[in-house]
Amino acid sequence: MNQLFVQTEKIVDPREGKLQVVSNVDVCTKIAEFLESTLGPYGMDKLFAGKEIVVTNDGATILKHMNIRHPVGRLLVALSESQDSEVGDGTTSVVILTTEILSCLKPLIKDNFDLGCIKGCLEELRMMCIEHLEKMGMELDDEVLYKLAGTCITSKNIRHEKEYFSRMIVDAVKQAKIDDAESIGVKKVQGGSIGDSVAVNGIAFEKCFTYAGYEQQPKRILNPRILCLNVELEWKSERDNAEIRVGGVEEYQRVVDAEWAIIRRKLDEIISSGANVVLSSLSIGDYATQYFAKHGIFCAGRVSKEDLGRVVGSCGGSILGATDYLEGSLGACALFEERQLGKFRYNYFEGGGTSACTMILRGPGQEVLEEIGRSVHDAVCVVRTALRTRKVVTGGGSVEMELSRIIREKSMKYDDKRMFVAKAVGQAFEKIPLLLARNFGLDTISTIQDLRKRHANGDSCEGISIDGARDMQKLGIYEPLEVKKNMVKASFSAAASIIMIDSTIMAEKSQ
C-alpha cells in the first residue's frame, strides 16, 4: 500500500544540503500520490482499518489517519489541517499543489539553482496570484450560494442528495450566526437513509437517562419556560470517611428529615419560578422526577454541557449552580417536544426567534454517518466563508489554469534565472485540472491542451467537467474566493519553507 512507503521512510537522514532538500521533496511526492485519486467529483475513497473503520475522501482526515512519521510529511499534515480549520475546504488541493510546486522545482534544485533566489521568486509569484485572484472574484447572490454548496457536496458521499443538502445547509447557515461555530449543531442518528436527514429550527439532543416517574411527565409543551441548572436533585452519599454521630433514633430521624427538607426546598423553589422544563448537567433522581411529574413539569438530568450551553445560547437564560435566586433566569422558545427518531428519542426546542439550528443526519452505518458529518462540516464552512466575504470564483480547475497562464506569461518578462522558476510554478498549477481530467476518465493530454488553448483565448471560466473543458459559470460550479486565496498562500509558503530545509536534526524527547 502507498502509505506504507511513507511510514517506513527513514526519520534520521544523514544527508545535508541539496540532497536533503531533494529527499524532502520525494517524501512530499509520495504523500501527494496517495491523495491524487481522491480529488474531484469522481474521486475515490480511502479505507483505514484499525481499531475503528474509517471510509473517507477528505484530505485532512486521510492524512490524519496515515500515521506519517517523517518530519516534512508532518508539515503537510499540519498544512492540510490548517486549510480545514481556516476555510473548511481545499484540504486535498493544498497538499497536491504544494507538492507539485516542489516537484517542478526539483530539477532546478538539482542543477544548483540558488535556493534564496527560488524562495524570493515564489514570494513574488504568490503576491501576483493573490492580486489576480481578487480580480477574478464575482459577487455572491442566493442562487450562486446554493450552487456553491452543491459544488462542495459533489465530491462527497451525499452527492446523490446534492440539491436537498445544499438547501438544508444554506438555510441553516443563513439562520445561524455566521461567526458562531456552535450555533449549528450536528447530531448523527444511525438508521434510515441519507435523505432522511433534517434541519431543526432550534436545538435537538438525544433523550438523557431518566428515572421512575418520567412516563407521567408532559412530552409536548407550547411556549415552555426553560430552567438550566448545574445542580444535583437527588440524595447522594457523603464523601469518603465522612461521619455523623447520633445519640438515638430521634436524632437520626432529624438528620433524615433535614435531607428531605433540603431537596423539597430546592424543588419548590424551581416550581415557584414558573419553569415547566428543567434541564440539569447533573442527575435528577426518582423523587425529583416524580415530584416534577405531579406538577406537570418535564425534566432531564445529565444533559451534556455542550447541549446545555447551546440551549442557553439559543433560548436565553443562564446555567445556575443554585436554586435560591431564579428570577429572570428562565429561557423560552416556541415549542418543546420529545419525538421518536428511529430507535432513539430526541428532545426538540424549536422556534421563538432562535438563531440556532441542529442538523440531524441519518445513515445506514456509523462509518457512513461519520463521513456524512465530515461532508456537512466542509459544506457549512464553505457557505460561511462565502457569506463572510461575499466573493466567489469558478471551480473545476478553471482558477488554477488561469493562474498557470498568468504565471507563464510573467515568466517571459524575466531575463534571469527567475524565468525558469516561474515556468516551473506555472506548470505546477496545471496539476489540479489534470487530476480532475484523469479522475473523470478523460484523455488528460488532449483535455489539458484544449483547456490551455481556451484560456489563451480569454475564456478564464473554462474548467474540467465530465464532458471535457466547459464553462464553469454556465454549469454553476463555484467555490469561495477565500478558499482559493488561502490555498495559494499556504501552498507557496509551505513550498518556500520546505526548500529551505537543508538538514534534519532529531531532538531528544523531553523528560
From Swiss-Prot:
Protein source organism: Encephalitozoon cuniculi (strain GB-M1)
NCBIfam families: chap_CCT_eta
Record function comment: Molecular chaperone; assists the folding of proteins upon ATP hydrolysis.
GO CC terms in record: chaperonin-containing T-complex
Family to which the UniProt record says this protein belongs: Belongs to the TCP-1 chaperonin family.
Classification via CDD domains: TCP1_eta
Identification of the protein by name: T-complex protein 1 subunit eta
InterPro entries per the UniProt record, alphabetical: Chap_CCT_eta, Chaperone_TCP-1, Chaperonin_TCP-1_CS, Cpn60/GroEL/TCP-1, GroEL-like_apical_dom_sf, GROEL-like_equatorial_sf, TCP-1-like_intermed_sf
GO molecular-function terms, A-Z: ATP binding; ATP hydrolysis activity; ATP-dependent protein folding chaperone; unfolded protein binding
PANTHER family on file: CHAPERONIN
Subcellular location(s) of the protein: Cytoplasm
Domain of life: Eukaryota
Subunit structure: Component of the T-complex protein 1 (TCP1) complex.
Origin organism lineage: Eukaryota, Fungi, Fungi incertae sedis, Microsporidia, Unikaryonidae
Keywords attached to this entry: ATP-binding, Chaperone, Cytoplasm, Nucleotide-binding
